[in-house]
Amino acid sequence: MIKLNIDGSEIEVSEGSTVYQACTQAGKEIPHFCYHERLKIAGNCRMCLVEMEKSPKPIASCAMPVSNGMVIHTDTPMVKKAREGVMEFLLINHPLDCPICDQGGECDLQDQAFRYGKGTNRFHENKRSIKDKYMGPLIKTAMTRCIQCTRCIRFANDIAGIEEMGAIHRGEHMEVTSYLEQTLDSEMSGNMIDICPVGALNSKPYAFKARKWELKHTASIGVHDAEGSNIRIDSRGDEVMRILPRVNEEINEEWLSDKNRFSYDGLKYQRLDLPYIRKNGKLVEASWSEALKTIADKIKSVKPEKIAAIAGSLVSVEAMFMLKTLLQKLGSNNYSVNQFDYKFDTTQRGNYLFNTTIAGVEKADLCLLIGANLRQIAPVLNSRIGQRVRAGSLKVARIGEGHNQTYRIQDLGSDIKIIEELAIGTHEFTKALKAAKYPMIIVGDGVYARDDGYAILSLIHKIVAEYNIMRDDFQGFNMLHNHASIVGGLDIGFNTPIKLEELELTYLLGADELPFDKLKSAFIIYQGHHGDSGAANADVILPAAAYTEQSGIYVNLEGRPQIAEKAVAPVGVAKEDIEIIKELAGSLKIDIGMDNLQEVRVRLAKEYKIFANIDKIVESKFAKFSFKDKLSKEPITMGPINYYMTDVISKNSVTMAKCVEAKEKRNERAA
C-alpha cells in the first residue's frame, strides 16, 4: 500500500494507482474528460490538474502514479486558475449550441463549464468548423463539438477490439474519424455515444426526440440475447424513447450490444393489438370473450396428449410456468421452450449453463470454442474475452468454420475428427489443455443445433473429464445460449420432447420459428405481440404485451435470474401474458392456484430454489453425459447469422433494417 496526503488527510491506496484514483478514494471531485476507468489512460484533456508539492506546475492526476509521501492539493488558487484556463481553451472552438444538442442536460462539458469555467469568453476570432463524419445508421456526428478526448478511439481499440477509429492531422486541425467514413463494424458501437463527454457522438435513432428530464427511467433486462445485460428503458408516456445500459460488474459492466440498445423501434410496428379468430380461412377481429371461448371449446374437444405448448425466445419464466401449470391441469405434459430442436443435456443444471460465469472468464488462461460464434451471439461476453486476449492473459482456439472474431484466435479446423482426437488425447492441442491452469470450453449452436449434437456433446464431456475442466476451484464447461428464454425454460422443466406431426392443438407462446408445415393438421393458438409467422399460421390470436410492457423474470446463460420491470402499457387491448393464461384457465373452469404475478413468483421460489435468489447464481451440479450415435461427416459450422434480426422485435425494427443494409454495402466495398 502507498501512503500519501490529499488536502491534509492521510490515505492509503494500492500500488499502481493514479493520483486521480487516490483523490476519488479520498472523496474529492476531480473534473475530467478523457479519463475513463475502463479505458487506457491518455492524459489528453488536462482538466484533472491538481497541485503536487515540490512540483513547479500542476500535474495531470489521471496519468501520474502515486508514490509514498506525496502531498496533493485539489482546491488551491493555482488549481482553480489552471482548470479555468483549460476550460477556456476547450471552449475556444466549441460551438456552444447546447439548445439544439441532444447531449444537453446530460453533458459533461456543460456541467464542468458551469462548475469550473470562468463564465466569460475572451475569444472573438472565428471558430474552427469540422465536417461531420458518416459512421453508419446508429451514430450521428457533430464533430465541431469534439474536444479530442479520444475516448471513442480507445473504446474501439481496447473494448470493442476493432481498430476502426483514429485521429488525423495535428494540433487545432486534429479530427477524430473512422478513416474511410463507412459503417462501423462493431456490434457494440453504440457505447461510444455513452462515453463521449460532449455532443460529438449522438444516437441517430434518438436524435431530437426528447430531453433527459422528460423521461421515466425503468430498470430492465436486454432480451435480444442470452447474456442478460442490465438496461434502463427511458420512456415518455407509453412510448419507449431509448434504451441505455445499467452498470452490472458481473455481467455487462457498463456496456451494451447494439441490438439490445437500438432495436426498440421494432416495438411500434406490426403489433397485435386485438384478438383474432380465423373464419372461412381469414383472420377476423374478435372480442376477448369470443376468442377465449373458442379456445376453451376446442381444448375440451381434444385429447390431452394431443395438446402441446411451445414458448418463443422472448418469453418470461412466469408465463411459461403458468402455462405449464395449466397444461398439467388439463392432463398434458407436452411443453417446450426449444422451438429450434436444440440438443441440450438437462441431466443436471450445470450441463446446460455457462458455468465459468461471464465475469469468471477473466480467470481463464485458455479457451476452446466449439461451434460458437461469440461475436454475434454474445457481443458483451466476447468483449471481455477479447480484452483478456489483447492483454496476453488468455489464449483462444476454435473448432468450426466461423466468422471473424475481434481478437487473435488459433483455428484448429472444422472436422469432427478433431474433437475425437482431443477426447482420446492424440491431437496436438491436448498439450495446451494439459498445460493450462484454468481451461474453459464454450459450446455453441454449431454443435447443439446439429442432428448429431448429442453425440458431439458426449465427446466434449469426455474432454471435460480427461482434462479436469470441471472442478471445485474452476468450472470450465460452458454452453453458449442464444435466446433469453431458454435457460429459464429448462430450469422449470418446460422442455419435454414433442412430435409436432401428431398434435391436434398447439399453443404458441410467442413462438415464431417452427416448421409450420408439420402443424398443418393442428389447431394453432398464438399468444404474442407481433404479427409474424406464428400469427400468420394461427387459428386464434391473443394479443400479448412485449417485454417492455410487463414485468418478468429472465434467466441468463450463466443461470442468474433477473427481473425486467414494466416500463409502458401494452398496445390496444393487448394483455400481459399471465393475465391471458389466467383468463383462459377461467374459461376452462380450471383453478391453477395463481391469480397475480406475486403469487406466481412465490410459487416459483417454493418449487425452484434458484428463483428465491434473484440476481444471484446458485451452485449447480454437473454430470458427465454419454450418448452413442453415429457422427455426421459434415464439418462444424456456425452458419450465416443475421446479427441484427434474430427475433420478432428486431425483425420489425427499421433501425436494424438500416444496419443490415449498411453492413451489406460495407461488405460490398470490402469485396
Curated annotation (Swiss-Prot):
Location of the 4Fe-4S Mo/W bis-MGD-type domain: 215-271
Keyword presence, NAD: yes
4Fe-4S His(Cys)3-ligated-type domain sequence ranges: 78-117
Protein name as annotated: NADH-quinone oxidoreductase subunit G
Cofactor binding mode and count: Binds 1 [2Fe-2S] cluster per subunit. Binds 2 [4Fe-4S] clusters per subunit.
Reaction(s) this enzyme catalyzes, per UniProt: a quinone + NADH + 5 H(+)(in) = a quinol + NAD(+) + 4 H(+)(out)
Binding site for [4Fe-4S] cluster 2: 146, 149, 152, 196
Biological processes per GO annotation: ATP synthesis coupled electron transport
Role according to the record: NDH-1 shuttles electrons from NADH, via FMN and iron-sulfur (Fe-S) centers, to quinones in the respiratory chain. Couples the redox reaction to proton translocation (for every two electrons transferred, four hydrogen ions are translocated across the cytoplasmic membrane), and thus conserves the redox energy in a proton gradient.
Binding site for [4Fe-4S] cluster 1: 94, 98, 101, 107
Record's keyword terms, sorted: 2Fe-2S, 4Fe-4S, Iron, Iron-sulfur, Metal-binding, NAD, Quinone, Translocase
Cited InterPro entries: 2Fe-2S_ferredoxin-like_sf (IPR036010), 2Fe-2S_ferredoxin-type (IPR001041), Mopterin_OxRdtase (IPR006656), Mopterin_OxRdtase_4Fe-4S_dom (IPR006963), NADH_UbQ_OxRdtase_75kDa_su_CS (IPR000283), NADH_UbQ_OxRdtase_ferredoxin (IPR054351), NADH_UbQ_OxRdtase_Gsu (IPR010228), NADH_UbQ_OxRdtase_Gsu_4Fe4S-bd (IPR019574)
Family matches, as SUPFAM superfamilies: 2Fe-2S ferredoxin-like (SSF54292), 4Fe-4S ferredoxins (SSF54862), Formate dehydrogenase/DMSO reductase, domains 1-3 (SSF53706)
Positions of [2Fe-2S] cluster binding: 34, 45, 48, 62
EC number: 7.1.1.-
Family statement drawn from the similarity comment of this UniProt entry: Belongs to the complex I 75 kDa subunit family.
Keyword Iron: yes
Top-level taxon in the UniProt lineage: Bacteria
One MF term in the entry's GO annotations: NADH dehydrogenase (ubiquinone) activity
One Pfam match: Fer2_4
Cofactor section: [2Fe-2S] cluster; [4Fe-4S] cluster
Cellular component aspect of the GO annotation: membrane
Domain 2Fe-2S ferredoxin-type: 1-78
